[in-house]
Curated annotation (Swiss-Prot):
It comes from the Bacteria. It is found in: Cell inner membrane. The gene is corA. Pfam families: CorA. The keyword Glycoprotein does not apply. The record marks 254 as: Essential for ion permeation. Belongs to the CorA metal ion transporter (MIT) (TC 1.A.35) family. It comes from Blochmanniella floridana. Homopentamer. In the absence of Mg(2+), interactions between subunits are weakened, and dimers, trimers and tetramers can be observed in vitro. This is Magnesium transport protein CorA. The central ion permeation pathway is formed by the first transmembrane domain from each of the five subunits. Mg(2+) binding strengthens interactions between subunits and leads to the formation of a symmetrical homopentamer surrounding a closed ion permeation pathway. Low Mg(2+) concentrations trigger both a conformation change within each subunit and a loosening of the interactions between subunits. This results in an open ion conduction pathway. In addition, this results in a less symmetrical shape of the whole complex.
């Protein structure tokens, strides 16, 4: 399927595909989403009217992330999308700017595009050109990444109170699982920010942008420059909390080993004493010798445990 947008009074309006084909000159954005055979005729018709060859563009974008040619500007950039398992991942979106029209080639499940297209009235294009629209999409992407970074920070703060609590911690596995997910998300955000920075630097340095859009691109770049160290701090905090949890797990394991040593060492000593092959061992001839040995083993195992527990050494 595909979405087609027209610019009226500096605002975007979603158009019906059949209506647009008859008035193609006003189109500023064609968002192509997993086009199938049933729509190939319409796409071919649009391609002919716009004089753009999508098959040739796909060949160009296979070898290059960015390209500026006489035919147009081509950019491939990472955006967050949801995969089949409903997990967030970095996926490629292809952008083509040709004859003041923005083409986007992507799969479904990209949250930034859904957010942008659901609130078209909030996005006014003052200059009304395709570069302004492209930068608006990048700006929404950065806002989305910023929100995700803030969410990671809030989650880490909550986990910090749980991990650093003086009480004994239960559920180490779930905490480590949460931290692993946060670390993965933070890394994906880092890659996404770096990729967006490269795309914007390409636009600023290699493309002849209008003055307003060049200023807009530089502003987004400054925002990315501020976000990268912040996200790096988040990444380091995730690593610190992971190491803290691993340290607490080691302490808990040592405590368990200590309990086993305290409880089982004295009974083992008694049992091994009566395993010695001496000729004179009076207890072996007692009728109550065996129960006495069992009782003594239990007593010597329980007494040190209770004493250590009383002294709060365990």
């Amino acid at each position: 399927m595909f979405n087609i947008f027209q610019l009226k009074n500096n605002c975007l309006f979603r158009m019906d595909s059949q209506d647009v084909i008859s008035s193609i000159n006003d189109v500023i954005w064609i968002d192509i989403i997993q086009s199938d055979d049933n729509e190939s005729h319409d796409i071919q018709s649009i391609s002919e009217q716009f004089k753009i060859n999508f098959f040739e563009i796909k060949d160009i974008l296979k070898n290059k992330r960015f390209c500026n040619s006489k035919q147009g500007v081509y950019i491939r950039s990472f955006f967050f999308s949801y995969n089949e398992d409903n997990q967030i991942d970095n996926s490629i979106v292809s952008f083509i700017i040709c004859n003041n029209c923005l083409y986007t080639l992507r799969e479904s499940g990209f949250s930034v595009f859904c957010i942008y297209q659901e609130s078209l009235n909030n996005h006014v294009l003052n200059d009304g050109n395709a570069y302004e629209l492209l930068l608006s999409l990048f700006e929404v992407k950065i806002d989305d990444l910023t929100d995700r970074i803030e969410h990671i920070y809030e989650t880490l703060e909550r986990l910090s109170f749980v991990i650093m609590d003086e009480q004994q911690i239960d559920g180490y596995d779930s905490i480590l699982e949460d931290l692993a997910k946060l670390e993965s998300m933070s890394w994906k955000i880092h890659i996404n920010l770096l990729d967006t920075e490269r795309a914007l630097q390409f636009l600023v340095r290699k493309v002849k942008l209008p003055v307003t859009q060049k200023r807009h691109a530089n502003g987004i770049l400054r925002g990315i420059t501020l976000l990268l160290p912040y996200n790096e701090c988040i990444f380091q905090k995730v690593s610190f909390l992971t190491q803290s949890v691993m340290g607490l797990i080691n302490i808990e394991q040592n405590r368990i080993i200590k309990i086993f040593s305290i409880v089982f060492l004295p009974p083992t000593l008694i049992a091994s004493s009566y395993g010695m092959n001496f000729e004179f061992m009076p207890e072996l001839k007692w009728s109550f010798g065996y129960p006495s040995a069992i009782f003594l083993m239990i007593l010597t195992g329980l007494a040190p445990y209770l004493y250590f527990k009383y002294k709060k050494w365990l």
